[in-house]
Amino acid sequence: MATMVPSVLWPRACWTLLVCCLLTPGVQGQEFLLRVEPQNPVLSAGGSLFVNCSTDCPSSEKIALETSLSKELVASGMGWAAFNLSNVTGNSRILCSVYCNGSQITGSSNITVYRLPERVELAPLPPWQRVGQNFTLRCQVEGGSPRTSLTVVLLRWEEELSRQPAVEEPAEVTATVLASRDDHGAPFSCRTELDMQPQGLGLFVNTSAPRQLRTFVLPVTPPRLVAPRFLEVETSWPVDCTLDGLFPASEAQVYLALGDQMLNATVMNHGDTLTATATATARADQEGAREIVCNVTLGGERREARENLTVFSFLGPTVNLSEPTAPEGSTVTVSCMAGARVQVTLDGVPAAAPGQPAQLQLNATESDDRRSFFCSATLEVDGEFLHRNSSVQLRVLYGPKIDRATCPQHLKWKDKTTHVLQCQARGNPYPELRCLKEGSSREVPVGIPFFVNVTHNGTYQCQASSSRGKYTLVVVMDIEAGSSHFVPVFVAVLLTLGVVTIVLALMYVFREHKRSGSYHVREESTYLPLTSMQPTQAMGEEPSRAE
């Protein structure tokens, strides 16, 4: 152990020689002693000490104190002297001497100075420490004495990791620690303990400023990057980047980019999984082969994933009509075009080459009204064929017409019934259809129910009219007048009377039939045959009896 000794102290050999010279033969036989108090004191560096030298010799001379320290005689008397030692900075030995009866007697005391360390510092920790690998704690201690009582302790939180004595000056104490997830964010520190308890002073503790450790786990696998293979100019598409087994995921840095264009990513973490989502929007100046890059950085290490992406421009297809609304009989040109490298097909007819338009002509007829023309466009991008379709509708202007198949020219209806005149007109612009009775301004509704009577009988002019002309169809309504209600009522009455008469006649005949036939008399009576009544006889006369 190295002990700090002030430069003003004499070499130990010189002191030994001085003590030997002061001792005279026969000193061991003296019966009086010289006491030095306090004996072997301990005090902090730079402190003061009051020393008393005394003897029981009745004929002692002046007591002297020999020391390299700064001293001052405070008081003295017969057989004693008091001194004050100031600015005691190092260990020292003091010697008191006096002559008693011509002989020199001496007494000594060893002063021990303790000093707290001037610097206790834990060396900086690595910015990031991978979990499962060792790292070294290093504590440096300057100053502090006595070294035999000085111990250095390395701590995690309040847990002791290592306890070692401070040996050299300056002292350096190290400990090897295996990094774990639990060490992330943990404070590490260094503490010195100067144990002066055996000297009755106590335990003096100095602690360094703590240093925080950050541990991490970064898998060797790259992130999973989900991005489109193709992206059209001025369109957007979501991009996702995910990495599992990351710790601490919340402290990872994510960089997402389309080429040299950094994407604004939203980063979320759940447990040890990190997910970054961004929207990639392609610019016109990025057309061609590009890369989507996802870069995850943690603990000074990086994991990266890349995906190829092609930015393309797909204009069209655009379908045009020379006349969107064409008169019947006119010539209409239909054309379809798209961007460069795009192959277009118009109503099944392909263009001569990619990038060229497709055309067709037609003579507009009534059947072409509302006809749709379809154009398909195909673009090849890195071996993939992309398709788009477009269409346009042609309107043809033609005069009004009435469909004879749906509008009967002769109608035979009964009086006082409800019917619908089913007639439809067509044309572009759509015509107005009216049916007026000849010789009058009477109009019958078309397409809605109405009540028919004999006044509707006659010939009607059904006319469809528009800005393109007029079309007339003759419709004849034949209304059958119904017979009088008296005849069926009279017939019903006669039938009723006939039925009643027949019923009464049948009832009479049935009753008379019950009254005719033979009668039975009592057994004691004489049997008399009945005779028929003569027509000339009265109803009340009895028949004559034979004598």
From Swiss-Prot:
Leukocytes. Upon stimulation by a physiologic stimuli becomes rapidly and transiently phosphorylated on serine residues. One of its GO terms (cellular component) is plasma membrane. The lineage of its organism: Eukaryota, Metazoa, Chordata, Craniata, Vertebrata. The gene is ICAM3. Residues 511-547 are cytoplasmic. Belongs to the immunoglobulin superfamily. ICAM family. One of its GO terms (biological process) is cell-cell adhesion. Keywords: Cell adhesion, Disulfide bond, Glycoprotein, Immunoglobulin domain, Membrane, Phagocytosis, Phosphoprotein, Repeat, Signal, Transmembrane, Transmembrane helix. It comes from Pan troglodytes. GO terms for molecular function: integrin binding. This is Intercellular adhesion molecule 3.
